[in-house]
A protein has these predicted regions:
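Long, contiguous amphipathic alpha-helices that act as assembly "spine/axial" helices in icosahedral shell
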Residues: 1-36, 66-82, 114, 141, ...
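Short, conserved, surface-exposed binding loops centered on an aromatic residue
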Residues: 63-68, 104-106
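Phosphate-interacting basic helix/loop segments used at nucleotide- and nucleic-acid interfaces
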Residues: 52-66
Length: 190
């Protein structure tokens, strides 16, 4: 359980980190969206649903020198966005549409895999090579525990030194302001 919690916390820091933020934890290091400054797309004025057009804009924004190995790149999206994109493909009256409904397929946008990341915000995506994201952890990882006998809680603190960077910052496209209206059903409480 400790490793799962640490991986979740690190994923949150990698995605949402920003040293100018107000959250003590997230301000420890700049995350992938904060570090990306060259190719930033803003879809705030768009009202389109998740479709191929948002992915096309990311590919067009990527410098041509990196597109030679497009199949090695990834679109990192939220699970909701990945599901919405799969649903848009499933609406097609073709074998691809049928396959998206019947099987858990890996979806592609213009030859680039679309991968869901559990803590990715719904309104954002990241387009880059997986190996372009450099995440470093110092060897000295300290695990400390304490027990609060009154509340019967075991407290575990994991301390480590980390850093995050891009090997090639201009080989990253980030998008924000994407539509988050995923046609979710209205729930009522009794």
């Amino acid at each position: 359980l400790i490793t799962e919690r640490v991986s979740t916390d690190l994923e949150e820091l990698i995605i949402d980190g920003g040293t100018d933020g107000t959250d003590d934890y997230l301000s420890l290091v700049d995350g992938v969206f904060t570090l990306s400054t060259s190719n930033v797309l803003d879809f705030s004025d768009e009202t389109d649903d998740v479709s191929k057009h948002i992915f096309k804009a990311g590919i067009v924004s990527m410098p041509n020198k990196y597109l030679r190995k497009r199949d090695a790149m990834r679109f990192y999206v939220s699970p909701n966005m990945e599901l919405e994109y799969a649903d848009s493909l499933a609406d097609r009256a073709t074998p691809l549409g049928d396959a998206n409904i019947q099987r858990n397929m890996f979806n592609y946008a213009y030859g680039v895999p679309v991968k869901p990341v559990s803590l990715m915000p719904d309104a954002k995506y990241l387009f880059t090579f997986p190996k372009n994201i450099i995440f470093g952890v110092q060897r000295d990882i300290m695990i400390e525990s304490d027990r609060d006998i009154r509340t019967q809680v075991l407290i575990v603190v994991v301390t480590m030194r980390i850093d995050l960077a891009y090997e090639e910052e201009d080989a990253v496209v980030t998008a924000s302001g994407l539509s988050t209206d995923f046609n979710q059903p209205t729930t009522t409480t009794a």
